[in-house]
């Protein structure tokens, strides 16, 4: 299961009722942030979510409304007795930006690891030191697979996909049929390959068909692109920017490389996602719910996001 919390649903500048862009993903008590706009710390405190367990911060792009919360957050995490490294993932330029942001912070009690402009998939595993993310190799033991998509904005910008892998079901009858010793059943269930005597035992000898996991996709600060529908295909939850609610603001959306509610709904429909959650609202958009119909005309299963929105995403049988 994944638990998602929309910490900030605003774009451009903070508002009294709306912090800037940030999403928290909770997996087995450990946390991933996507973007860290101004107000993220305050939002985390409101949610009683805790700072020490944030292991990974994924940045979509380096515009201020998505990164200005980083220095304060990292400092607070240091004050919470965190000692394990924190990994920051982002597009080209993230390393230079982080060097600048870190100048404002006294020495941290933990290290910062940066993954800049990854070209392939990344794998996340849950360890005793928290969530660890690295370049994916075979993906066999990765619990979450992360992929990025280059978007169309005025700065290098990533969309993020998080796929929570689900192990095939253990089939004891299959294990017995294949003469697999009971002593190694549990290891094979975990994806390990075991050599015993003159025989090699692989997980497929005890496991059934591959089962569908959970897919969460996050896209903000972009114009619609031809690659997005396939990339978000069959997402259980598609979180997408809706900077402009009114279709009359299409010229602004094109000029500023953002999207309208209608365009987000069109992408959700083309991508055959299960649910669309809109976020990243313009400061001029005082009542996003007033324009909900513009998205729902294209995609009925649309929710207007708000600071503090929470959702559990569970496996489907």
From Swiss-Prot:
Zinc phosphodiesterase, which displays some tRNA 3'-processing endonuclease activity. Probably involved in tRNA maturation, by removing a 3'-trailer from precursor tRNA. GO terms for molecular function: 3'-tRNA processing endoribonuclease activity; zinc ion binding. Homodimer. Zn(2+) 1 binds at residues 61, 63, 153, 221. This is Ribonuclease Z. Keywords: Endonuclease, Hydrolase, Metal-binding, Nuclease, tRNA processing, Zinc. Its EC number is 3.1.26.11. Zn(2+) 2 binds at residues 65-66, 221, 280. Its cofactor is Zn(2+). Binds 2 Zn(2+) ions. It catalyses: Endonucleolytic cleavage of RNA, removing extra 3' nucleotides from tRNA precursor, generating 3' termini of tRNAs. A 3'-hydroxy group is left at the tRNA terminus and a 5'-phosphoryl group is left at the trailer molecule. Coiled coil: none annotated. Belongs to the RNase Z family. The lineage of its organism: Bacteria, Bacillati, Bacillota, Clostridia, Peptostreptococcales. SUPFAM superfamilies: Metallo-hydrolase/oxidoreductase. The keyword Protein biosynthesis does not apply. PANTHER family: ZINC PHOSPHODIESTERASE ELAC PROTEIN 1. It is an enzyme of class 3 (hydrolase). It comes from Alkaliphilus oremlandii (strain OhILAs) (Clostridium oremlandii (strain OhILAs)).
